């Protein structure tokens, strides 16, 4: 790829598992909170959601759905459609049909929020997590997380969640999705098991990284068995400290996990791993940021290249995400640091993003205030313009 111009690598074909892509501009999963409430804790994809995904679909392009709760007990946000009721499956089928009509591919991102919820979202139930450590601050419903600390999951409950992921993957295929992405990052349930500062278990699912990785590997095996490894990916975020997660040694610990993923039998090995790039403002705590700024010292940002290399040995593709722009996206591919690039915010405000990037058309700026719901719901959702 070294002889190509900066953006050309984004528009070369790529095969990831079962998916033959015509370009490498992937739509990242973006929670938008615009689905219809059917009953307490249950939101269903609606016609506006169909329009949103259809707008952003492209021939041979890969889309990742917004994070989608696998069960009633997995939810923690309003307006987010799940994949656990017949009406949700039917609603998603309209979305996937619309994407396929435009020649696109779409995967369902399977989600369990773990402790990132409150009883108000769970019909009064106590949130489940690896340990009884609550998130600091308030939830979206205004309740303080610490007022209802999570209950540590029993081993039987962990096994049940593994089965729920597998069952949800089958429902996703029933709804017309081309495959699934397991959400293993951003401080949600699987990430809570992985980070040693919020997992203080002393059984087979806590302590060593071998134990903390166990549920992730079990879910990968269960989901790949359910729908086929070539239709499965997983998202991880070792350096992005969402919701109080902060591991003591991400490079070592996620290095172990990636080596294990790459070493899985072919029938259980996911087609890709999707990772979020480290950011300066997230990898340092507040005192470290102040020290670095006061002394003007150079901060060496951790790299995902070692993790990418481990996965590549097993033939596992790598999708990179995290504040990519036209200026730096192609370079990531030219240096073989990733196979494809996932764009989130730019896809929100540019429904025709692949075309704009390919033709050098000016990008529309996004409005952060409309990311998570708006009045009317079309605002900042389906009203961004296409290029002329």
Swiss-Prot record:
<dbReference type="InterPro" id="IPR001155">
    <property type="entry name" value="OxRdtase_FMN_N"/>
</dbReference>
<dbReference type="InterPro" id="IPR045247">
    <property type="entry name" value="Oye-like"/>
</dbReference>
<dbReference type="Pfam" id="PF00724">
    <property type="entry name" value="Oxidored_FMN"/>
</dbReference>
<comment type="function">
    <text>Flavin oxidoreductase, part of the hnx cluster involved in the purine degradation. The nicotinate hydroxylase hnxS accepts nicotinate as a substrate and catalyzes the first step of nicotinate catabolism. The major facilitator-type transporters hxnP and hxnZ are probably involved in the uptake of nicotinate-derived metabolites, and the oxidoreductases hxnT and hxnY in the further metabolism of 6-OH nicotinic acid.</text>
</comment>
<dbReference type="GO" id="GO:0003959">
    <property type="term" value="F:NADPH dehydrogenase activity"/>
</dbReference>
<comment type="similarity">
    <text>Belongs to the NADH:flavin oxidoreductase/NADH oxidase family.</text>
</comment>
<dbReference type="GO" id="GO:0010181">
    <property type="term" value="F:FMN binding"/>
</dbReference>
<dbReference type="InterPro" id="IPR013785">
    <property type="entry name" value="Aldolase_TIM"/>
</dbReference>
<keyword id="KW-0560">Oxidoreductase</keyword>
<protein>
    <recommendedName>
        <fullName>Flavin oxidoreductase hxnT</fullName>
        <ecNumber>1.-.-.-</ecNumber>
    </recommendedName>
</protein>
């Amino acid at each position: 790829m070294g002889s190509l111009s900066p953006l050309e690598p984004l528009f070369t074909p790529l095969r990831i598992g079962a998916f033959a892509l015509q370009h490498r501009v992937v739509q990242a999963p973006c929670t938008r909170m615009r689905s219809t409430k059917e009953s307490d804790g249950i939101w269903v994809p609606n016609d506006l959601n169909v329009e949103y995904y259809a707008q952003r679909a492209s021939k041979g392009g890969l889309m990742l759905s917004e994070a989608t709760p696998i069960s009633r007990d997995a939810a923690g946000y309003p307006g987010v459609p799940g994949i656990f009721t017949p009406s949700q499956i039917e609603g998603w089928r309209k979305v996937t049909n619309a994407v396929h009509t435009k020649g696109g591919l779409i995967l369902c991102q399977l989600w369990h929020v773990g402790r990132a919820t409150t009883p108000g979202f769970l019909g009064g139930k106590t949130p489940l997590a690896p340990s009884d450590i609550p998130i600091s601050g308030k939830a979206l419903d205004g309740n303080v997380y610490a007022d209802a600390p999570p209950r540590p999951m029993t081993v039987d409950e962990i096994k049940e969640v593994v089965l729920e992921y597998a069952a949800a993957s089958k429902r996703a295929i029933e709804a017309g999705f081309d495959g699934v992405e397991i959400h293993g990052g951003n401080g949600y349930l699987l990430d809570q098991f992985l980070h040693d500062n919020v997992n203080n278990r002393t059984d087979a699912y806590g302590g060593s990284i071998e134990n903390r990785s166990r549920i992730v590997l079990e879910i990968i095996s269960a989901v790949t068995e359910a729908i086929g490894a070539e239709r499965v990916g997983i998202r991880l975020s070792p350096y992005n400290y969402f919701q109080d997660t902060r591991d003591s040694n991400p490079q070592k610990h996620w290095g172990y996990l990636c080596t294990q993923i790459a070493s899985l039998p072919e029938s259980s090995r996911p087609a890709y791993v999707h990772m979020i790039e480290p950011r300066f403002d997230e990898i340092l705590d507040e005192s470290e940021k102040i020290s670095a700024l006061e002394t003007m010292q150079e901060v060496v940002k951790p790299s995902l290249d070692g993790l990418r290399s481990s996965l590549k040995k097993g033939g596992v593709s790598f999708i990179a995400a995290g504040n990519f722009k036209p200026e730096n996206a192609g370079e990531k591919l030219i240096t073989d640091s990733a196979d494809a690039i996932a764009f989130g915010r730019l896809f929100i405000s540019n429904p025709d993003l692949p075309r704009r990037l390919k033709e050098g058309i000016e990008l529309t700026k996004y409005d952060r205030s409309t990311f998570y719901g708006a009045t009317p719901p079309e605002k900042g959702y389906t009203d961004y313009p296409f290029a002329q």
